[in-house]
Structures are given as structure tokens and as C-alpha cells.
């Protein structure tokens, strides 16, 4: 009987891990997860000071971006871009993006993102993977390239890993980012 109860405990732990591994809310960027309140991480003054109108061109778009760079609480990423609903006084997170610059060698960015992708493939179980290489639409010279990997979950949530190899004329620094986005933000972004 003791053997069976041990087996049941092991099986329960195993299946619980699988279930957790397919919920992006269990994944963190700089300690933040989808569904968390930004107020648990930053003061309201910092949030308001760093609110950006990146989506003003999207009619009736219900989300705003907060971009925080080089903050003392950021340990792994140079900056984070956070998405919350407009007028939400609790600043509940629907999208989290962490990014770093590749100032010396973009190949380091490619290596880092390949390792992160391998980790995601080990951690998460139920998703479709899409990969794409394309020219960035912000660069009129068409010399800026993006290498992207998307993890699309059955419930509409998405994780993306991107490397931006910017053309010299646009003047941006090469960078990579990792985004975790809840279904509601993904749908709103695609539909507007």
C-alpha cells in the first residue's frame, strides 16, 4: 500500500508540473507575470512617468505601454515594456517584454535566444511554433532584419523571441526581446 501511495504522489506532482508548464502566467520576466499588478513592482509615479503612447495610431485600442529602462530593480534585462489596460488603476499586466541590446556582437544575441528557445521547448508542452525572418517595416532602407520565433498556445496566449539586426541608416542598436502576452492583448493587437 505504501508503494502505491508514493506512486500516486509522484504522478500527481508530475501531472501538476505539466499543467503549470502550459500556463504562461507561471513564466516570469524580471519577477513579473501575466495577471500581476505593476504596483507590486513600481511606484505609481514611475508607472505614469514611463507611460508611452505607442499605439495612438490604433483606433479604440484598449491597452497602453509602460517602458522602463535601466531601473535598479531590473537584473536580467536592460528594459521592460509592459502592457496594461487603459484606465486600470491596478495596472494588471497583459503583456510583458524584456529586452537587451547587442552592442558588441549580434551573434551573442542569436546564441542567447537559441538557448531561451530550447528552454521553452523543454518547459512548455502544448503550443504551435512558428519561425519567421523578415525585413522590419520601420526601416525604409529595408536593411533591418528580424528573426522571430512564436509560441502560440491553444488558449490564444503567445510567447515570442525576436532578434533585431538593425540597418546602419536607421541608427538603432541591435537588440533581442522576449515577450509573454495574454490572449486578450494578442487579440486586441491583431484586430486593431
Question: How does the language model describe each region?
Answer:
Residues 67-92:
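Compositionally biased P/S/T/G-rich terminal and signal peptide-adjacent segments
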Residues 12, 71-73, 87-89, 140-142, ...:
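Sterically constrained small-residue positions within well-ordered secondary structures
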Residues 2-5, 41:
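Asparagine-rich low-complexity intrinsically disordered tracts
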Residues 4-15:
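Sec-dependent N-terminal signal peptides
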